[in-house]
A protein has these predicted regions:
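An exposed, glycine/acidic-rich loop-and-rim segment of catalytic or binding clefts
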Residues: 1-194
Length: 195
């Protein structure tokens, strides 16, 4: 099962039944109730304290997550973490936004463009398989904008593994702030989200 060693001490982590641990275990941070430390019109600060040994990880870990609406009409996301013992940590953000403003609508009618011509292949256990797949002529081809739902029900092995779009897209211009990574547009609301 999943394990790691730090300073000569081995830690066995919660096994997902497939010999791995995903998202820090179950329940993961996404299933925890976070405390609201600050909330106003422009910012919300959330905090979660993971107790020592939770899902097998050493150290009490305090994670602070800040979402800020900036004067540049953007959303900044900032993570901070402090631990009482050496541990492993790889925080990420899986937030998603329905820019329609209508929570009864799904995102499937929204148009998406992604600056990517390759994705990471996943094996049947939803693990990165170590191979990059071209997106051309596949449901993952968002090099020309189209509705998210247009191809989501296609007969595609990679869609079947994850039950939809839950893949890593390899960007053509990574880290280049002059080129967007993705653009999402909702025709009904007129809103655009640029990442």
């Amino acid at each position: 099962g999943p394990e790691f060693s730090i300073d000569g001490h081995s830690y066995r982590l919660q096994d997902d039944g497939k010999g791995h641990i995903a998202h820090g275990g179950k329940p993961g941070f996404q299933n925890r109730v976070w405390d609201v430390m600050q909330a106003d019109r422009q910012k919300i600060v959330l905090q979660y304290v993971s107790p020592n040994g939770e899902n097998g990880f050493p150290g009490e870990l305090t994670v602070t997550l800040t979402y800020t609406l900036t004067d540049r009409n953007s959303v900044d996301v900032d993570f901070k973490a402090e631990t009482t013992k050496p541990t492993v940590l790889n925080l990420t953000n899986h937030s998603f936004f329905n820019i329609s403003g209508d929570l009864s609508r799904t995102v499937l009618s929204q148009n998406l463009w992604i600056d990517s011509n390759r994705i990471a292949e996943y094996d049947k256990g939803k693990n990165v398989a170590g191979k990059l797949l071209g997106v051309r002529n596949t449901p993952f081809d968002f090099t020309k904008p189209h509705q998210i739902g247009k191809r989501i029900d296609s007969d595609d092995a990679q869609l079947a593994v994850t039950g939809g779009y839950d893949h890593s897209f390899l960007l053509r211009h990574p880290g280049d702030m002059r080129n967007p990574a993705a653009i999402l547009y909702d025709a009904q609301s007129g809103r655009t989200l640029t990442v």
